[in-house]
């Protein structure tokens, strides 16, 4: 298995699909990475030589991925919460942030129902 950005990339998949195993790399970005590295999208990872894998590593290194991206997202949310803005308050209360209704629905964000005591 090839190791890129600290992730074991599956050998038996095509390069474009295999790169999506990295957090922060989707189909569009993986196509751009393959194009920049000069690798065909339909080539499987096991068929690449070490120089091509190294060029993939170099191209992936230009983007914020994996732990750095997770840390950046959590720091952005923490900053909103520290500012005390509306979005930060919604994050702090574990409610939907983007204007969705909460009278009904929103169960994923709110968690399981809490029993009402009479």
Swiss-Prot record:
One of its GO terms (molecular function) is tRNA binding. It comes from Aeromonas hydrophila subsp. hydrophila (strain ATCC 7966 / DSM 30187 / BCRC 13018 / CCUG 14551 / JCM 1027 / KCTC 2358 / NCIMB 9240 / NCTC 8049). Residues 94-118 are annotated as: Disordered. Keywords: Ribonucleoprotein, Ribosomal protein, RNA-binding, rRNA-binding, tRNA-binding. Coiled coil: none annotated. Located at the top of the head of the 30S subunit, it contacts several helices of the 16S rRNA. In the 70S ribosome it contacts the 23S rRNA (bridge B1a) and protein L5 of the 50S subunit (bridge B1b), connecting the 2 subunits; these bridges are implicated in subunit movement. Contacts the tRNAs in the A and P-sites. Pfam families: Ribosomal_S13. One of its GO terms (biological process) is translation. The keyword Aminoacyl-tRNA synthetase does not apply. Part of the 30S ribosomal subunit. Forms a loose heterodimer with protein S19. Forms two bridges to the 50S subunit in the 70S ribosome. This is Small ribosomal subunit protein uS13. Belongs to the universal ribosomal protein uS13 family. One of its GO terms (cellular component) is cytosol. InterPro entries: Rbsml_uS13_C, Ribosomal_uS13, Ribosomal_uS13-like_H2TH, Ribosomal_uS13_bac-type, Ribosomal_uS13_CS.
